[in-house]
Structure formats: C-alpha cells, structure tokens
C-alpha cells in the first residue's frame, strides 16, 4: 500500500465506524460506550480509487501516565508517528469539546498532515458543530456520516488534496512518464496522438451501480413535495397550497429505469430576513445539509413566476457548494404560449446564471407527471459530467494548443508562463494549472481556460474549479521508462 492514515480523536466520535467503512468489513468493535477500542488496529483499506493502510486507534484520553487510558493514548501517539497523515475525527452533532481542542493541539505538534473529519454530519444540529470546528486550527472540516457512507467522495478528494496525487498514486504511476523537462520536444510528445490515457481504466469516472443522491430545493410552494410524490407514485409527503408545509429534509428511496435514487425533499428556502421562527431556521439549515450530501440538486422554479431573487440565491449557493444543478420549470400545465415562454426561460437561464454555462433546464408538471423522464435523463447526464475525469496527457495536449492560439497576457512587461495542467478532483471537476506568477494571472484568462475546458471536453452545466499555483515540473524525479 502506498500510504498510511491514522484515524484519531476523542472517544465515541465514530472512529471505528469510519475504519470499518474504509476497510469494507466490520473489523472494529463499535459501541456507544467511550473507550471501546483499546489497541490500534491496522488494515488494508480502499476509498474509490485510493488504496492505503488505515490505523484505528483508541480514543485519545487525558489520564495519569500509569492508567489504562494513558496506555491507550500512547498507542494513539504511536499510530500518529507511523502514519503519513491523520484523519482527526470529531462529532459534529456534539460539537467541539475541551478534549477535542487539547488533542487537536497534540496532533498539530506532531507535524503530520491532517484532514479534519466532521462525523455524524447527517444529524440535526450538526451544522453548528461544523462551524465550531474551524477553531481547532486544522483547516476546513470535511462533513461525513461514517455510519451511512455519506460524504465519502469529499473525504477522498480531501485526502488527495492533502497528500497530492503524486503521493497517493505513487505505486500506480511509478512506471509512467519518463524523466523529462517541459522542453519543446517534450511538449510535442504530449501533443502527439500516440499517448495512451493511463487514467481511463485505472480511475473509473462513473459508477452507475451506486444510488444517485438528489436534493429537490426551491422557494416555498414551488411544488417540490408534489414532484416527489409523483416520482414515488404515492402521497409520501404532505402537500398543499400553504407555503412552508415541509419542515424537515425528508429522504425517500426510488428507482428510475433500474437506477437506484435517494431523493431528498427539503423545506422551502426563504430569504434570511423572512426566516423568523427558530423552527424555520432549523428547516433551512436542514435544507443546506441536504444540498451538501446530495450529488445533483434539482432547483424547482414556479414557471408562472420564475427567477425571483430567492431562486437565483438558491442556485448560486448550490453552485458555490460544487453540486450539479438541474432546473425544473414546474407548473408547466398552467403556461399557455409554451414555445415562446420556454425560449424566454432558456435565455434567462443563460443570462442570469452565467457561472455554469449549459445549465440544463426542463419544463415539467409535478402534479400531472409530465416531463419527469426528460428531467431524469438530464439529471443522470449532468451527474456523469460532474464525475468526469480527464487524463493529464489529454489536458496538456489541449493546453498546448490553447496557449499557441491565445497565450497569457504580459503583466508589467513580463509574459506569464503556463507550464502544465492536471485534474486534482471530480465532483465537481477541479483542475490545477502550474504557471510562473499565479497572483498576476488575470481572471479573464482563467475564465477563458474554464470556458475552453467546458467546450472541448463537453462539460456543460456543472461547476468547474480551476486554481493556479507555482510548482515544479510534474515529471521531475520520475524514472525514465525503458522501451
């Protein structure tokens, strides 16, 4: 295995549950009693395309040096020293305790890279705990539910970002590209047609066997619950003309054309100024949590009064959260001049939500069941794009052509040099460009690259992340491949 992760944290935060999730079997004893795990346990683990070893540890305890708790703590400290990185687990539902703060300091002193894992994030009231987690100084918390398997894709991406692709895929790639520099000849090789895609089979971009998680959001009374009842074929959710009937984020299992779906109906999301009573504040927080655990978010708009300010705010939130949005223009049965109205709605979608070009939008009637299949076809396609992975070879062949056609501008009389590009994550697609002076790169050129990626690699309707950094040549230090 290429690297080792130690799962640490105070007792009863879900470390052993996460260990079992990563190992794929119930190897660790799990109970509600603190201190169930007394010895550190190490096992081969897998998280999607990542293969590694994981260490389950006793809960960190403050105790006298001659006590059992002290020996458990010593086991944990030994695990930290053996590991390449630490998964520091907190209980988002319970919030940050003094013990969390004490042992976060100990983990920081170890100098090991850390992913802050906010477990039990599916629970009501966990939102406050995740916000409080920032005070630990371990970076942004990664919300998961180890028990239910939610948030695992984000945990995978956090590990890759922490250790770097070269580290986490070291064994898989040690036989890959030669030890070269980015000379014109090397760039020419990248642009050639004879380079195989090393990632195509090694990292499958899409797994249609896993349930697709969909959140259905929108303003109050847009028809979200009616739509879900039509999908399920039963009156599972309370509906009516009164705005705000749905208080909680409610989940339901469904199957569409053989594809398993987890549906989340959410409370209607209002402007903050109108969120007065405590219960409604909790409902909005529940909706935000549903969005974060979803993969695709269907934004239900009332076609008779679309694109209110709240609609745009909801869409912007979904895009900033990196989820895959699809718009459903509901109550289409009430529209008379449908062809003209639809053309107008498509134009407004492109104009009012320019941050995601090609956003998919479908007219439906939740009450009559019209347009549901078309909506789901667009949901599945958007989900596939959201999971898309492009090999480094293809990206750099494209980048070389882009630079030749439109090089970066000169800043303060000095030309910016773009060296190479790689994809660092999916869900949504995220890319890193290595260049000479990242801070000086105009945002207009960054948008130019994003738009080019979207068009060339057929990625409409999903957020695309692109960051700039200064780094060494990605091929430096690799052993030259012998022919």
Curated annotation (Swiss-Prot):
This is GTPase Der. InterPro entries: G_ENGA (IPR031166), GTP-bd (IPR006073), GTPase_Der (IPR016484), KH_dom-like (IPR032859), KH_dom-like_a/b (IPR015946), P-loop_NTPase (IPR027417), Small_GTP-bd (IPR005225). Gene3D superfamilies: 3.30.300.20, P-loop containing nucleotide triphosphate hydrolases. It comes from the Bacteria. GTP 1 binds at residues 9-16, 56-60, 119-122. Residues 388-472 form the KH-like domain. Associates with the 50S ribosomal subunit. Residues 3-167, 212-387 form the EngA-type G domain. It comes from Brucella abortus (strain 2308). Keywords: GTP-binding, Nucleotide-binding, Repeat, Ribosome biogenesis. GTPase that plays an essential role in the late steps of ribosome biogenesis.
């Amino acid at each position: 295995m290429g690297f080792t992760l130690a799962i640490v944290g105070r007792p009863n935060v879900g470390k052993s549950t996460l260990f079992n999730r990563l190992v794929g079997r119930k190897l660790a004893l799990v109970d509600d009693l603190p201190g169930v795990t007394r010895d550190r346990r190490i096992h081969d683990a897998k998280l999607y395309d990542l293969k590694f070893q994981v260490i389950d540890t006793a809960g960190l305890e403050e105790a006298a040096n001659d006590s059992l708790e002290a020996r458990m703590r010593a086991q944990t400290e030994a695990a930290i020293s053996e590991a390449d990185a630490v998964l520091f687990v907190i209980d988002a539902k319970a919030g940050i305790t003094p013990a969390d703060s004490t042992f976060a300091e100990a983990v920081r002193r170890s100098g090991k890279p850390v992913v802050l894992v906010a477990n039990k994030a599916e629970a009501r009231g966990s939102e406050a705990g995740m916000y409080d987690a920032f005070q630990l100084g371990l970076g942004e918390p990664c919300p998961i539910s180890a028990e239910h398997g939610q948030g695992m894709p984000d945990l995978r991406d956090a590990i890759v970002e922490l250790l770097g692709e070269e580290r986490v895929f070291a064994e898989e790639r040690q036989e890959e590209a030669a030890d070269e520099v980015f000379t014109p000849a090397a760039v020419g090789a990248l642009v050639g047609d004879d380079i195989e895609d090393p990632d195509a089979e090694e990292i499958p971009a899409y797994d249609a066997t896993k349930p697709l998680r969909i959140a259905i959001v929108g303003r109050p009374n847009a028809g979200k619950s009616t739509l879900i009842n039509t999908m399920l074929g039963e009156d599972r959710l309370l509906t009516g003309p009164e705005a705000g009937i749905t208080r909680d984020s409610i989940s339901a299992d469904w199957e569409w054309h053989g594809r398993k779906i987890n549906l989340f109906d959410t409370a209607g999301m209002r402007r903050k100024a109108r969120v007065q009573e405590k219960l409604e504040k909790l409902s909005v927080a529940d909706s935000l949590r549903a969005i974060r655990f979803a993969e695709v978010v269907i934004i239900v708009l009332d076609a008779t009064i679309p694109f209110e300010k709240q609609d745009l705010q909801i869409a912007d939130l979904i895009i900033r959260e990196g989820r895959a949005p699809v718009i459903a223009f509901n109550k289409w049965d009430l529209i008379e001049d449908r062809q003209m109205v639809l053309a107008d709605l498509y134009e407004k979608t492109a104009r009012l939500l320019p941050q995601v070009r090609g956003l998919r939008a479908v007219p439906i009637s939740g009450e009559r069941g019209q347009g549901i299949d078309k909506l789901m076809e667009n949901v599945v396609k958007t989900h596939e794009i959201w999971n898309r992975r492009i090999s480094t070879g293809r990206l750099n062949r494209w980048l070389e052509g882009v630079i030749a056609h439109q090089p970066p501008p000169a800043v303060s009389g000095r030309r910016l040099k773009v060296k190479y590009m790689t994809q660092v994550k999916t869900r949504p697609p995220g890319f890193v460009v290595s260049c000479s002076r990242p801070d000086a790169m105009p945002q207009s050129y960054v948008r130019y690259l994003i738009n080019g990626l979207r068009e060339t690699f057929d990625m409409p309707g999903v957020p695309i992340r692109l960051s700039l950094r200064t780094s060494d040549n990605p091929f430096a230090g690799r052993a030259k491949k012998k022919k």
